Every structure is written in structure tokens, then in C-alpha cells.
Amino acid sequence: MALPIIIDCDPGHDDAIALVLALASPELEVKAITSSAGNQTPEKTLRNVLRMLTLLKRPDIPVAGGAVKPLMRELIIADNVHGESGLNGPALPEPSFAPQSGTAVELMAKTLRESAQPVTIVSTGPQTNVALLLNSHPELHTKIARIVIMGGAMALGNWTPAAEFNIYVDPEAAEIVFQSGIPVVMAGLDVTHKAQIHAADIERFRAIGNPISTIVAELLDFFMEYHKDEKWGFVGAPLHDPCTIAWLLKPEIFTTVERWVGVETKGKYTQGMTVVDYYFLTGNKPNATVMVDVDRQGFVDLLAERLQYYA
């Protein structure tokens, strides 16, 4: 039986590729997609979900827009990474269908209520929508199998020296998610910076030759430019968000540890930092499965294999 999932995302190049991977995988049943504000403004990320589903010919999947700003802060966006549209690079279609009239939280709650089995929530943007769901519907916590997030880092940040972007945008929301008691799987920068796509991998995807693999290659062409900055020391571009979907499909290509994670919401220098109790110093019981390594070639091979689905 396919694993039921809800995807909450803020497309964003890597979010878009995570959608491509999920919808090419019969092991997963994508029951709903909600948009969050993060990589771009809420209007643009919602539009980008609709554009991607139009491209992938999946107007059957319910879509709803989420919160327009973080729980307690003003919105920060990453237009320097993802461009003015949030998906700069390829020519994507205009949406062929409209989102549902309700909110992301309403769609998530409805999906959980109606599911015969617990649902996995995959969150590849700030945690605002998921935190609002958890706070407003405590009766539905048992309907959530786990929450798989792209966010955080044990070591170095990518938006501040201490903080990864998704967590930094809404640290209060992330803290709610980590302390919810629901199993959390964290794909942080420690693993996603190892899931780099090299120039040769992009050409491999392009050579598959179907319309979707071509679009993915063009998304990566644009995404690669930001990551060529020497300060990162990257060979390619880290493909953050697809690590969440890849873990669901092939957990064996990832190395994980069970640890307690908290989010710093007030630090002068460390606001938005995910504090991972790696050496069990706090006495707190682990609340997260933390990805720490990935078989990069296995990750690339999985993407290439699933892009064949669109032939």
C-alpha cells in the first residue's frame, strides 16, 4: 500500500524537484499539497505549486495556500537564491486550475480526518503551517505518522552563521514541531550539503530527454549559479528538499542518528539555530531522527531513475 503524505512546501527550485520526485514514485500517495511563504512571497509559492502540478498533469491533487507570514515575525524571502518568480530558469506553464478556497491548515486537517491510516507530513519550507495545524487540532496528532522536514543543521548555518534558512524564517514554529511529541525526521544542512548535484549530473538528467527531465535540468542550471560562490566551497548545488522524499523512498542511502533537537528563538547570535544534543548532555529523550550523511551517488541515481517515469 502506498504511503499517504501531505507536502507543505515553498517552491523554490529544490521544492519543485521534490514534487517531481514524489509524483514519480508509486510508493507514495500525495493526498494534498499546501504552500508556505519562504523562498518567495506566499502568492508566488502558491502559484508555483499550481504551475508544477500543471506541468506534471496532476490537477487532481488538492492544493491550498498557507500562512502569509511567520507566527511572530515579519517574512524573510530568499529571492537572491530562487529569483523573482521563485522558479527562475525554465519556461513553466501557467496554472490550469485553482487552489481550494480554504486554508492550508483546513486542507491538512480534512486530509488527516479522512485518511484511513496515519499520514506523513513532508515540510520543505518554514514550519508555520505545520505548527498552526498542531496548535489548532490537537485531536489530530494521532493521525500524523511523522513529520519529515528539510531544515536546520547540527553545525553551520546557511542564512546566518548558526541558522539554516527554513528554521530561521520561523523558529517559533519549528520549536512547536520539534517539541510536539510526534516523530520528526530532520534533513538538515549536514546531509543536504552532501547531496550535491554536479554539472555532469545535470547533463545526465537533460539527456533523459523527456519534458520533465529537461525542466529539472533547467531548474538546476539556474540553481547552480547561486552556489558557484566560492564562499560555499561546493562542487555542485546542494539539493536540499528532495532529501525528504528520497529518505521516504530509500532510507538505506542515508545515515541517521536519534537525538533531541530544540530551536533557539531568542539568541543574539544563534536565533533560529537547531540545537542538536549529539552527546546526550541534556538528559532529554531523543525527539528526532537526524540525517547526517547520504550516499550521494545513490541519491543522484534515484533522481535519474524516477525522471524516467515521465517518458
From Swiss-Prot:
The active site is at 240. Pfam families: IU_nuc_hydro. Belongs to the IUNH family. RihA subfamily. Disulfide bonds: none annotated. This is Pyrimidine-specific ribonucleoside hydrolase RihA. The keyword Hydrolase applies. InterPro entries: I/U_nuclsd_hydro_CS, Inosine/uridine_hydrolase_dom, IUNH, Pyrim_hydro_RihA, Ribo_hydro-like. It comes from Salmonella enteritidis PT4 (strain P125109). Hydrolyzes cytidine or uridine to ribose and cytosine or uracil, respectively. Its EC number is 3.2.-.-. The gene is rihA. One of its GO terms (biological process) is nucleobase-containing small molecule interconversion. GO terms for cellular component: cytosol. Signal peptide: none annotated. Keywords: Glycosidase, Hydrolase. It is an enzyme of class 3 (hydrolase). PANTHER family: INOSINE-URIDINE PREFERRING NUCLEOSIDE HYDROLASE (PTHR12304), URIDINE NUCLEOSIDASE (PTHR12304:SF4). GO terms for molecular function: purine nucleosidase activity; uridine nucleosidase activity. The keyword Protein biosynthesis does not apply.
